Amino acid sequence: GLVEILLSTPSCGALRLMMPLLVKLSQEGKWIILINPPHTPLFSEWVREGVILSNVLVIDFPETDEDIEKKYLWAYEQALKFHGCGIALFWCDELAIGKGRRLKLSAESGETLGLILRPSIYRRHPLAASSRLQLDIIPKDPEYIEPREYAPLSLKVTHIKGNGAPNKQEYILTL
């Protein structure tokens, strides 16, 4: 299926939240495909957690590329259809409704979990995803500075939409 995750900040702990799944998938020999990540993940921490990096693929194009959006969408669609892929994560901003539907169909045709990570400013512009989540960092104190990917943090996870699930459920997680 396809899940849309809205992020309050680019490094709000989304990858850390998914780490147990990433470890499991990589150890099962499944591919983890990251498309257009906002920064290079701390792969040394991934290895420490147990991720097998030979099963991780990062796809990133130069920002000067004229067809960058088309290339990212094509790469994500192929990842969703690829049966050897366990999870495909795509960081993007605005996405046309028709393209979101096409990605949902690609996700349903394969066995890959597809995650689209977008800034929370797009909350009023939902994609055709099976589920929507909002991730917000809970600051520890007024002097709060945005954390590194693996600094201790607390997250508020809001379940906005899901098939058969009640809407607007909130969970507090400490990572």
Per-segment meaning from a language model:
Residues 1-175:
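N-terminal regions of ATP-driven nucleic-acid and macromolecular assemblies
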